[in-house]
Amino acid sequence: MMLGVIADDFTGASDIASFLVENGLSAVQMNGVPKQPLNSRVDAIVISLKSRSNPANEAVEQSLNAYNWLQENGCTQFYFKYCSTFDSTAKGNIGPVTDALLEALNEDFTVITPALPVNGRTIFNGYLFVGEQLLSESGMKNHPITPMTDANLMRLMDAQAKGKTGLVAYADVIQGAARVKERFAELKAQGYRYAVVDAADNSQLEVLAEAVAGLKLVTGGSGLGAYIAARLSGGKKGTNAFTPTKGKTVVLSGSCSVMTNKQVEKYCEKAPHFQLDAAQAINNPNYAEELYQWVTANLDAPLAPMVYATVPPEALKAIQNEFGADKASHAIENTFAQLAAKLKRYGVTNFINAGGETSSIVVQQLGFSGFHIGKQIAPGVPWLKAVEEDIYLALKSGNFGKEDFFEYAQGMFV
């Protein structure tokens, strides 16, 4: 059986791909929907889209295109991968995409499990937690694109999907896969189309991986993907992951998450750093060139130069109020994209990126068709190597990694 993964952003794609490889599957990550058939044999194909914050109709179209290609290339079970903090409001697209994939597969039931306990994302009684905080009380309530003000996954799903969402509670999950499958049958009989499944630690994800073996569509974060991979590989562990070659390196940080703010603050103590100015990104057509000149002048420093748009919540709100959230974010993303392209032409070979939107736009601009999956820098954040040439990327979702992430990643160079 070949697993086909449809990921709604690039950091999410590398997140789940790293867990698949770590748990014994051979996998390749594709940058968007390929135009040609896959010419290598693998256990899993991960397609990375840039659809997380898109209007529902656009996300559905992208996801169905990915599904069709995966099916044509031999995949028989499909995994819709979204963020472990859900990142989808009432206007979001997780519900519509899930519905579209169910209909394409002629199926009427699937699971909703964004849990990733290794990074503090757990589900209890259908509520999503980030560490000890409810999702709605965490830093995600201030997300610039998808502010998460409700932690109840049943309500979140019902607000955006066609069907009803039920719960497989912790008390059922700890009884094992047979009981979970019984609950699936009970919920289906009661007219539920989706089941949020509690997962307070990895043992519940291991149970769920067995319970969903017969489902053609599974949805969730990378945590469940890891245990599906472990089941498919028979518990084999991946051993051939690479680390990057030392070379010209840059850090680009666009995330405004709580952890990325801490990581940026810590890195600023040791490395050359330049804070991207939103007004300049919007109004100055030469801004990317000015940033490029600064980066290239600092490439010989002991630690890589960093360009960052990362700011605390209060500063982010001020930027959004002054310029508009969409206008500011698009200008900043476009500046990062132009800068990355210039730096690649200059000879930069290692790109460390923080933030899903930043990573997505940088990868699109660099134009690679796919990536080999390397060693993990942190859970869910592997090194990637472009299939076309020796360019290495780290694509970090906002809240992933420890405070020393940027320096630690460079310590892995060989």
UniProtKB/Swiss-Prot annotation:
Its EC number is 2.7.1.217. Keywords: ATP-binding, Carbohydrate metabolism, Kinase, Nucleotide-binding, Transferase. The keyword Nucleotide-binding applies. It is an enzyme of class 2 (transferase). It catalyses: 3-dehydro-L-erythronate + ATP = 3-dehydro-4-O-phospho-L-erythronate + ADP + H(+); 3-dehydro-D-erythronate + ATP = 3-dehydro-4-O-phospho-D-erythronate + ADP + H(+). ATP binds at residues 255, 355-358, 398. InterPro entries: 4-carb_acid_sugar_kinase_N, 4-carb_acid_sugar_kinase_N_sf, NBD_C, NBD_C_sf, OtnK. GO terms for molecular function: ATP binding; kinase activity. Belongs to the four-carbon acid sugar kinase family. Catalyzes the ATP-dependent phosphorylation of 3-oxo-tetronate to 3-oxo-tetronate 4-phosphate. This is 3-oxo-tetronate kinase.
